């Protein structure tokens, strides 16, 4: 799937939309194309949405497969799948470009230019670096603000995310806890809680 999520912040809805990943010249660069909604986080004003559903603004671009959005105060965070690695946690800022498909910490699939690596440094290509890139991939999924019991336990602001596998060749599911600095703009540390192959709630 393309991946998508949404959050509400003030008078606006922020909606993330993924990018088709088949390597075709027709769709390859949609995340960088300002005339396309694919690979974007868009900003929609709630009060005018019914009358003008297509009246939205591109908030950020260069996204591959966003899986979740959340916020701490006025800061917006996104997690997304990379290709064969390079899953990302991003701090989303207006007008920023996160680089897909021109940079990634993942690797091309074999049908995609013989499995060659992407340009990895986002900053060197004038794109926004992820707050954290997960290599190898953990299949990161939804993300949310940590519940108060975890914030109290760690004595830090934190985000909690699910992953489909823990890696070392993918055994088991896990929970990732991203501990943030005081300004919520850098990762202080990460804790992984292994859940195993069977997850019961």
Spans of features found by a protein language model:
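Residue-level signal for tight coil/turn positions that link beta-strands
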Residues: 10-11, 73
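Asp-box/WD-like beta-propeller blade repeats and closely related beta-sheet repeat scaffolds
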Residues: 1-9
């Amino acid at each position: 799937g393309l991946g998508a999520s949404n959050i509400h912040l003030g008078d606006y809805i922020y909606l993330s939309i993924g990018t088709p990943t088949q390597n075709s010249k027709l769709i390859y660069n949609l995340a960088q194309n300002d005339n396309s909604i694919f690979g974007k986080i868009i900003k929609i004003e709630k009060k005018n949405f019914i009358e003008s559903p297509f009246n939205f603004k591109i908030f950020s671009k260069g996204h591959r497969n966003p899986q979740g959005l959340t916020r701490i105060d006025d800061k917006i965070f996104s997690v997304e799948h990379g290709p064969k690695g390079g899953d990302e946690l991003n701090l989303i800022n207006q007008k920023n470009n996160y680089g897909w498909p021109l940079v990634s910490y993942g690797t091309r699939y074999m049908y995609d230019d013989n499995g060659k690596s992407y340009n990895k440094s986002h900053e060197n290509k004038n794109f926004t670096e992820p707050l954290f890139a997960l290599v190898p991939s953990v299949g990161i999924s939804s993300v949310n603000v940590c519940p108060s019991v975890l914030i109290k336990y760690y004595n830090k602001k934190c985000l909690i995310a699910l992953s489909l596998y823990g890696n070392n060749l993918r055994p088991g599911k896990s929970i990732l806890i991203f501990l943030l600095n005081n300004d919520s703009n850098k990762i202080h540390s990460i804790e992984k809680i292994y859940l195993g192959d069977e997850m019961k709630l």
